[in-house]
């Protein structure tokens, strides 16, 4: 199954432009970004321990900077739950943490709205149950904190109340900017991880 359909919520609905919610607009605007990230992760097989460690390492590096930015820029009470802690603990359990590279800084630009960033980071957690099934016995019980966690799914259910509203005066452009910057940040982390793996080979 494609990365965009397992990591991100698969939705095939259409909405009339005059009734499009912010969620509709974000989903349509970031569809190409879904595809790019899907393709960049397509070679990972989570049933293989080495690929599982790579997958978690990419998420640790990408989410660290994003979480730091959201802590300072999201509305009070709307900061997504921290995932870097569970990921790091899982990597330690799998013996993969020493291979992680320093997390790059996340800077979506002054025009970015935190809601677009939160949309991507929360939506990316929705397919974790499917990924957990893909990993199978390769992922021991003591290393399932990230994929089996419920905190981000609970946050997504709350976030949908904001995403269900109509876009603001800018037509959702600031939220789109934030979401696209977040996708781009993840894609760069995938590239950095590949370079680090090639150098170590």
Label every PLM stretch briefly.
Residues 1-201:
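Metal- and O2-centered redox machinery and metal/ROS homeostasis
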